[in-house]
């Protein structure tokens, strides 16, 4: 059970600690501070990263994708101060060395929580629960909002899956519930990430050894494997692949599938327009940069929907792989509280 304390004005407060202040950790903080009213009762109570505090402050203030922070950012007495709000900064590679007895939830954003020993360091330090910002076999459960949130039953280590799975799973759940999915294939056209080099360099995956900004790079994605965990009723029915492209932000899922029923394009688009929540939609002829900073998990491009009389269906969705996912981290924190 999370330890919730009473705020001075009588509201319950959930104290959240961000471990790892990289792309997702910083985006989580930016999203929260831009609109804290969306997540009432959450307090960002601390940040930990192995980088120097000065670098943490600099990278938060000046962001190459989302632009500079419009308010004031400073370092004061070992804390990051944003528009007068002070957040303690820590610098350790081993989270279990900290005293987190007053923390309700650790957002594990280092990208390294692949083993149980690493994933539970926040618990060892005294925190109530851990939310991992990526796939992890060490998690007690993998949850995607809009797909399987009912799987949350008090588990202490929760994986928020991946940005691509958060885009794919709600679409697959809606389509399967309405028309039945026989089989399908999803390709994510994904912007480059920090896992790729800026110049050719050795890597375990040969295509990913090539300069990220110079080529389209066919590679793998964990989305199909994670979809099997999130929606076991579709286990083995969906294959997935990725193409990394020279774009800094916003990706898309191109989902082709065979359905049991025979929906029309209008029926499919009407269903996506009506659902709301983590699924957005657009009728406009947009390109990727137009979807930057959209908070939804996926935004359906209705003009791209295609259907054949034989049951072949194609749906296409945009997603800001950093901003949308960071919003889901905060939404999931609310669920866990």
Which residues does each predicted region cover?
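Short, Lys/Arg-enriched N-terminal segments with co-localized hydrophobic residues
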Residues: 1-13
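N-terminal Rossmann-like NAD(P) cofactor-binding subdomain of oxidoreductases
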Residues: 10-209, 331
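Active-site-lining helix/loop region of Rossmann-like oxidoreductase modules
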Residues: 15-19, 23-30, 74, 173-276
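Flexible, active-site-adjacent loop/turn segments at secondary-structure boundaries
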Residues: 57-60, 64, 93-98, 141-143, ...
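Generic structural signal for residues in well-ordered beta-strands
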Residues: 87-89, 238, 315
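Structured loop/turn residues at secondary-structure junctions
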Residues: 110-111, 163, 219, 260, ...
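Short, conserved micro-motifs enriched in small and acidic residues
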Residues: 158, 162, 166, 214, ...
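C-terminal active-site/capping subdomain that shapes the small-molecule cofactor and substrate pocket
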Residues: 240, 252, 256-337
């Amino acid at each position: 059970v999370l330890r919730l304390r009473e705020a001075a004005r009588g509201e319950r407060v959930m104290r959240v600690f961000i471990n790892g202040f990289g792309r997702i950790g910083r985006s989580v903080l930016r999203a929260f501070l831009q609109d804290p009213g969306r997540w009432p009762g959450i307090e960002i109570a601390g940040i930990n990263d192995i980088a120097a505090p000065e670098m943490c402050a600099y990278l938060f203030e000046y962001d190459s994708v989302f632009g500079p922070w419009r308010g004031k950012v400073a370092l004061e007495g070992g804390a990051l101060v944003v528009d007068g709000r002070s957040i303690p900064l820590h610098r350790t590679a081993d989270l279990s060395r900290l005293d987190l007895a007053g923390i309700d939830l650790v957002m594990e954003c280092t990208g390294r929580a692949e083993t149980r020993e690493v994933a539970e360091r926040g618990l060892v330090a005294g925190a109530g629960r851990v939310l991992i910002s990526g796939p992890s076999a060490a998690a007690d459960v993998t949850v995607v909002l809009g797909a399987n949130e009912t799987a949350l039953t008090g588990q202490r280590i929760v994986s928020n899956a991946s940005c691509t799975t958060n885009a794919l799973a709600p679409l697959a759940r809606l389509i399967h519930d309405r028309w039945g999915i026989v089989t399908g294939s999803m390709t994510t056209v994904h912007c480059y990430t920090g896992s790729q080099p800026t110049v050719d360099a050795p890597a375990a995956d040969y295509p990913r050894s090539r300069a990220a900004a110079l080529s389209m790079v066919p590679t793998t994605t964990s989305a199909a494997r994670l979809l099997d965990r999130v929606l076991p009723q579709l286990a083995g029915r969906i294959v997935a692949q990725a193409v990394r492209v020279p774009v800094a932000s916003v990706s898309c899922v191109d989902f082709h599938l065979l359905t049991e029923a025979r929906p029309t394009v209008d029926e499919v688009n009407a269903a996506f327009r009506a659902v709301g929540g983590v699924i957005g939609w657009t009728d406009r002829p947009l390109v990727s940069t137009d979807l930057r900073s959209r908070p939804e998990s996926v935004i359906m491009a209705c003009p791209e929907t295609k259907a054949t009389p034989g049951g072949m269906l194609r749906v296409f969705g945009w997603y800001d792989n950093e901003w949308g996912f960071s919003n889901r981290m905060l939404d999931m924190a609310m669920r866990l509280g």
